[in-house]
Amino acid sequence: TAPRHTEVTLTSADGARIALPGSKATTDKPLRYCPRSEVGTGLRGAGPSSRQVNNYALGNDVETSHLLACEVLTPGGNWSSYPPHKHDEHTEVERVLEEIYYYQVRAGEGDAEGFALQRIYPSPGHDIDVCTEVRGGDVVVMPYGYHGPSVAAPGYDLYYLNVMAGPAEDSVWLMTDDPHHTWVRQTWEGQEVDPRLPMTPMND
């Protein structure tokens, strides 16, 4: 992260695909380089809801002005962003955060093009209803509403970059589950995490 009106140069000796998440900043935070070894990594869910989350600016000591960013890696056939949840009102347990998913899907046998499915549906006071196929390079904007699941088709591992921003100055991620589906979390206690995870190296 960098303060406003700061020029930053990015280089890679081996080449790279670089994503530059951004949002409107209202305060200046210290310039911060977060090497791979300091990225917060974790496994969420269990069984067919297993996925890996790499936190770049979410739940760690990277200071931002409104911006949150992480990436989610989901093995083919699994569901992520599940149970469905929302963050479209400001309360003690939730923050208003608009969200963008940028997707990449691992090709299958013979370079078969993979795909995934994304669901968004109404939350109280917010009318939205989306169920769409997504492929590599697609972006879905989630301004409000319950979102999830993100479903990786069997055989096609799913990646998405998750970028959020909202009006609150505290830059924290607080969300609430759809109460009809939050019970699903209890079922994870009796299931193993998918053995295909982690998909990238984990940090302690």
Region spans (language model):
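Short, structured patches in soluble enzyme cores that scaffold and shape functional sites
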Residues: 12-14, 20-24, 57-60, 70-76, ...
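Generic beta-strand structural signal
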Residues: 6-8, 14-18, 66-70, 99
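Short, conserved beta-strand element in jelly-roll/cupin
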Residues: 71-74, 93-125, 133, 141, ...
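A short secondary-structure junction signal
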Residues: 29-34, 67-70, 79-87, 114-119, ...
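Double-stranded beta-helix
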Residues: 16-58, 122, 154, 161-204
